[in-house]
Amino acid sequence: MHIVVVIPTYNEAENLPKLVPALFALPLNLDILVVDDNSPDGTGQIADDLAATYPKRVRVMHRTGKLGLSSAYLQAFRSLFENTVDAIGQMDADFSHDPSALVEMVKRIDTCDLVLGSRYVPGGSTDIYWPIWRKALSAWGNFYARSILRMPLRDVTGGFRLWRRETLQAMPLERVKASGYIFTVEMAYLAWCLGFKIGEVPIYFADRRWGKSKMSFKIQVEAAVRVWQVMWAYRDLQHKKSLAR
């Protein structure tokens, strides 16, 4: 199985040179597509250097500015549709997502259309050093989203995922309007509404080792509001799903 892992970057100069070799150390037929939003810390140049070190295995997509997580993924997905890739991965560049978990996710993708790296299934967890309030906020945000959208999934807000290429290609991506972190919720909801089979694999979600987190309380509040917009945007698909039961 040929896999391409998409890694959006913005100021990940400390993390990217460590993550790429870690991914290539896995027993997988894996390539990497870095999507850099003109990082001022030189991440784009580092990505180019990695592409030179690993020719044909690392590709870099340079964008003109900080255009956002959702547009980075959507642009990358579309660029891979004409490729021979079998599966497309999503992961953060900051080691919040343990690269080794991809091995189990690849095993599951044989029988699923989408595999989620899940913090909230048995065996999954969040950083042991997080304070209680942060663990509670993360769990509440996830519970809130999946409850409002009535999805029978345990982790809909996480960003560690593996898609079958055919699944992404069959989805109406032109309808995806979310920006920022709510993008992960919208994509899971759209896949679920369309009836795709979604599996979950337990992961340990670690705090970033290097660099500064881009998550903030403001972003989380905005995401809570936008969950309702996601539900409204796909009410036609939800209606069809209800009729099909």
What feature does the model see in each segment?
Residues I7-V20, N38:
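Active-site beta-to-alpha loop of glycosyltransferases that engages the nucleotide-sugar donor
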Residues M61-E82, A87, P99-Y181, R208-K218, ...:
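Acceptor/aglycone-binding surface of glycosyltransferases and processive sugar-polymer synthases
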Residues Q90, L116-S118, V201-I203:
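Short glycine/serine/threonine-enriched helix-capping/active-site loop
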Residues M1-I3, F143, R150-M151, L173-R245:
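Hydrophobic helical membrane-anchoring modules
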Residues P21-L30:
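Short, acidic, metal-binding catalytic loop of nucleotide-sugar glycosyltransferases
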Residues D36-Q45, G65, F95:
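A conserved acidic beta->alpha catalytic loop
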Residues L30-S39, M61-H62, M91:
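Short beta-strand/loop segment that forms part of the nucleotide-sugar
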Residues E14-K18, D41-L50:
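Acidic helix N-cap motif at the loop->helix transition within catalytic regions
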